[in-house]
């Protein structure tokens, strides 16, 4: 079977589950993963035969994909902020909306902390003066794959970055990604909703979290590939306490956020005003930011002076 025939066969099979465009995109991704060749190179060699072991691999991937398993879990790869991250079913698949959260944090860190921005620039050019600048400390709560802290460390290399999760398996994935990207991150296994554990977490300048925020009742509206494969622990909260994690984050920030620090959280698109009100009720100035689809997706909160 040639490269071209293999891709056409895969794409046709995927149209049982996806529209034509998405099926084509997934087929491209899988073929690049199997062959190690970019699309342009595969086109130039479309009549080349696919090696038997590669064909076996492709058939196994196809079998998994036809069970609605997300392609990121099949290939154990998801792209985030221009970097490949290892993912498996112990962690959520990183979403483009979360990249916007990372961008917002980076902009705030540079814009509100000019001394830190200079320090980062100084490190890039080997300026020894940067060693005297204050260290920016940040904590990602519920880190999952580690995509947020790893990406922030890449953007803000002088930052001291911490990340916690209740899941030992998720932390193993996050540590693997930090090592692959050569980004030192301090990982901690913590049940964040247990306030007795807060003393083990550092005081920081930035708290970031993409916590579970989907009410259990929303399961009926969700795609099968999400429900069947992504970890429910990282997705769902009780219908009667949908803001449980945001309440805990706000209370933790009251005690562990530096005086000029900031909280950034990803939110449910329907709960923006309620999340903002929650932070404001605990003494924060809060702001909602929409994502690229025009949906309420992020909240920034700063303690009122």
Per-region residue spans from a language model:
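C-terminal beta-strand of the catalytic ATP-binding
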Residues: 213, 302-305
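Residue-level signal for inorganic ion chemistry
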Residues: 30, 68, 98, 148, ...
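Conserved Class I SAM-dependent methyltransferase catalytic core
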Residues: 239-302
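Mobile active-site "lid"/loop adjacent to the S-adenosyl-L-methionine
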Residues: 213-244
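Conserved SAM/SAH cofactor-binding pocket of Class I
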Residues: 100-121, 126-221, 248
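Conserved hydrophobic residues forming the short capping helix/wall of the S-adenosyl-L-methionine
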Residues: 14, 109, 178, 253, ...
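Conserved AdoMet
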Residues: 29-108
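Non-catalytic accessory regions of SAM-dependent methyltransferases
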Residues: 1-43, 47-50
């Amino acid at each position: 079977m040639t490269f071209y025939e293999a891709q056409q066969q895969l794409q046709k099979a995927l149209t049982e589950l996806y529209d034509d465009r998405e099926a084509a995109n997934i087929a491209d991704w899988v073929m690049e993963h199997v062959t190690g060749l970019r699309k342009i190179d595969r086109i130039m060699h479309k009549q080349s035969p696919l090696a038997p072991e590669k064909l076996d691999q492709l058939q196994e991937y196809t079998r998994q994909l036809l069970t609605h398993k997300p392609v990121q879990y099949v290939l154990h790869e998801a792209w985030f902020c221009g970097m490949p991250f290892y993912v498996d079913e112990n962690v959520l698949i990183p979403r483009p909306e979360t990249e916007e959260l990372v961008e917002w944090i980076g902009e705030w860190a540079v814009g509100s902390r000019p001394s830190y921005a200079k320090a980062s620039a100084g490190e890039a050019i080997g300026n020894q003066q940067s060693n005297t600048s204050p260290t920016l400390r940040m904590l990602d709560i519920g880190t999952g794959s580690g995509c947020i802290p790893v990406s922030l460390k890449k953007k803000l290399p002088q930052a001291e970055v911490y990340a916690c999760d209740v899941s030992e398996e998720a932390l193993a994935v996050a540590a693997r990604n930090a090592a692959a990207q050569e980004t030192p991150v301090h990982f901690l296994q913590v049940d964040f909703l247990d306030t007795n554990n807060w003393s083990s977490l550092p005081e920081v300048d930035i708290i970031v979290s993409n916590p579970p925020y989907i009410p259990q009742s929303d399961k009926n509206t969700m795609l099968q590939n999400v429900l069947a494969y992504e970890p429910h622990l990282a997705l769902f909260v009780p219908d009667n306490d949908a803001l449980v994690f945001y309440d805990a984050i706000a209370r933790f920030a009251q005690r562990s956020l530096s005086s000029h620090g900031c909280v950034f959280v990803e939110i449910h698109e329907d709960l923006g005003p309620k999340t903002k009100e929650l932070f404001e009720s605990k003494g924060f100035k809060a702001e909602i930011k929409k994502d690229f689809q025009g949906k309420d997706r992020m909240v920034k909160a700063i303690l009122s002076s």
